[in-house]
Amino acid sequence: MRIIFTCGGTGGHINPAIAVAKLCQERMSDCQILFMGAEDGMENKLVPREGFRLETLKISNYQRKLTPAGIWHNVTTLFHMAGSMQKAKRVIREFQPDVIVGTGGYASFPALKMGAKLGVPTAVHESNAVPGLTTRMVAKDVDRIMVSFEDSRSQYADPEKVLVTGTPVRGEFLYTDKAAARAELGLGEKPLIVSAWGSLEIGRAHV
């Protein structure tokens, strides 16, 4: 089994793909996995750290604010898109995947779009209740849309494509022993308050 996972931008897109990739390796000893992401995304740190090969594309997100800087950014994004599509095509033909799985983020668009065009089975997972821009753009092309919530099914033009799976998480979250974790952190019986943050806004978090 040969699988391409395509994702990028934020950990919320990357970590679910890593979780599924690890599970595939555990259950299929002959499984070969390749990741595709953006040149400057968090995936460049997170994916190799988990031991997976990563192919990168020169691609960026679209700016919603149509300021002069935003317009220029979008023009540059469109310029790079053609090259990203061609590289995605080359990588897909060389790797010969059995399936391409995207977990959202702008970096997943070229591989999903090109994979569908080349006749490779494709699927996209959307963790958010309301689909993001990339998911909306590839929804008509992919073979399967996986979502975290039953209510999200109505967000798509073809509900028959939609499968409710929940959001993938790493296996260690499911089997961690509470007492052992507290001991490892040296907490003893002290009360513990956890403040959980995510995505790119974590840099602004403060108490």
Predicted segments with their positions:
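Conserved nucleotide-sugar phosphate-binding/catalytic loop shared by glycosyltransferases and other
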Residues: I3-T10, D30-G83, T165-T167, W197
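Conserved donor-binding/catalytic core segment of Leloir-type glycosyltransferases
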Residues: I4, L187-I202
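Short amphipathic alpha-helix
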Residues: H13-Q25
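Glycine-rich phosphate-binding loop signature in dinucleotide/nucleotide-binding domains
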Residues: M28-S29, R90-D98, L185-G188
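Active-site-proximal region of nucleotide-activated glycan assembly enzymes
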Residues: M42, R53, A116-A179
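A short helix/loop element that forms part of the nucleotide-sugar donor recognition site in Leloir-type
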Residues: W72-H73, L174-L187
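Glycosyltransferases and closely related glycan-assembly transferases
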Residues: K87-I100, A107-A123, R136-D141
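Conserved small/polar residues in nucleotide/adenosyl-binding loops
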Residues: A205-V207
